[in-house]
């Protein structure tokens, strides 16, 4: 299958809130569009472990009433969000891609999930993870080619966003489990500094970091900052800080280009696309420092 960036259009949420405010759209209607997309694409993409449709509809109805009353809880009030199945959710099982945890219902939400609910987000479902966040992948496919991997371990979160099933999802990372599937699926994603978003529960002593996948950079930032502003950072750590809207971009003065071992194996199309990116950066006035680093 050839890659077609037009096959799926990533959903955005930040541009829907004006319609919520003027009554021309509602969070419930937005959710129904997400559910319809999931019903159509999930049989192939296999991004979800659990979909909690009725609970999501109830949350979307409550959000619709808040927007109607001009009293949204936040800029993401009504946003459908998926949760990687490593993070605890009290009304859905947290099974971590592992048979030993089938039917495991935690008593509490993970701190990030709690913060999302406090902000009015609609918890859409639990997304597939590699077993225990490790190397054994789940059934999720890449939305642009079902024969290819979406990357892991936040595979379901990345694939669901890329397939246009929802505008954002939460992933977690130790080695590359947020940014790798985001790259494979073409999403925006943020891996904050460790401890920048409070992890809570059983992950409090792990090396993991929680962060969002999203179809737009605006939604990516908004989800991250809304969580951090409520849950804070880990004890003893400075939480993620910044404006409540997307920060203004800053052009870097210089960037280092590292040609690692994978560079020699890169296919011609990928190499050409990367070189074009470098050329665009140079034309924009960014100084590039190139080196080969095979250590």
Stretches found by the model and what they are:
Residues 1-57, 283-285:
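An N-terminal boundary/leader segment
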Residues 27-32, 61, 268-293:
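Acyltransferase
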Residues 56, 78, 84, 116, ...:
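Conserved hydrophobic/aromatic pocket- or pore-lining residues that grip, position, or stack substrates
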Residues 191-277, 284:
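A short helix-breaking turn/cap at a secondary-structure junction
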Residues 75-109:
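Enzymes and membrane/adaptor proteins characterized by extended Gly/Ser/Thr/Asp/Glu-rich
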Residues 108-227:
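Short glycine/serine-rich loop segments
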Residues 63-80, 219, 247-256:
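Immediate post-signal peptide segment of exported/extracytoplasmic ligand-binding proteins
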Residues 54-61, 120-121:
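Long amphipathic alpha-helix in the N-terminal Rossmann-like dinucleotide-binding domain
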